[in-house]
Curated annotation (Swiss-Prot):
GO biological process: tRNA wobble position uridine thiolation
Alphabetized GO MF terms: sulfur carrier activity; sulfurtransferase activity
Enzyme class: transferase
InterPro entries (UniProt xref): DsrEFH-like, Sulphur_relay_DsrE/F-like, Sulphur_relay_TusD/DsrE
Active-site positions on this chain: 81
Function: Could be part of a sulfur-relay system.
UniProt keyword Endoplasmic reticulum, yes or no: no
Gene Ontology CC entries for this record: sulfurtransferase complex
Protein name: Sulfurtransferase TusD homolog
Species assigned in the record: Vibrio vulnificus (strain YJ016)
PANTHER family: PROTEIN YCHN, SULFURTRANSFERASE TUSD
Top-rank lineage group of the source organism: Bacteria
Keywords in alphabetical order: Cytoplasm, Transferase
Coiled coil: none
Length: 131
């Protein structure tokens, strides 16, 4: 079987459900099998995966840092839906400036994107898997 190109869509919050962790495990498995993970699009409550203000207990898995490391090692785009993120208080530096906010909290390695980016991924990747 030839290698496929994937985009994942993560709707589950960083620690509120199992879906984000399952998406991460799926991502690492498909890379190990030789497939390419092009991007992960965080939508709805999934945008909370992109806040740098998440501080899990010392004995818990740090999912945000895991996504960052995966992205850096395998050149994966981490995109949070800008509209969903703003509604949930996940704000990039440029959005903070645009909306007159004094602070921003989008974690390094994540970017904010519109639904057009997800639509493009659906048209160009071999597989789009939603969690």
């Amino acid at each position: 079987m030839s290698a496929l190109r994937y985009t994942l869509v993560v709707n589950g919050s960083v620690y509120g459900s199992q879906s984000a962790r399952t998406a991460y495990q799926f991502a690492t498995a498909l890379i190990e099998k030789g497939h390419t993970l092009v991007s992960v699009f965080f939508y709805q409550d999934g945008v909370t995966n992109g806040t740098e203000l998440t501080v899990p207990a010392n004995d818990e898995f740090h999912l945000t840092k895991a996504w960052q490391q995966l992205a850096k090692q395998h050149n994966v785009r981490l995109e949070t839906c800008v509209a969903a993120a703003l509604r949930r208080g996940v704000v990039s530096q440029s959005e903070a400036s645009q909306h007159g906010l004094l602070q921003h909290n989008l974690a390094e390695g994540f970017e904010q994107a519109g639904l057009g980016s997800l639509a493009e991924a659906m048209l160009t990747q071999d597989r789009v898997v939603q969690f």
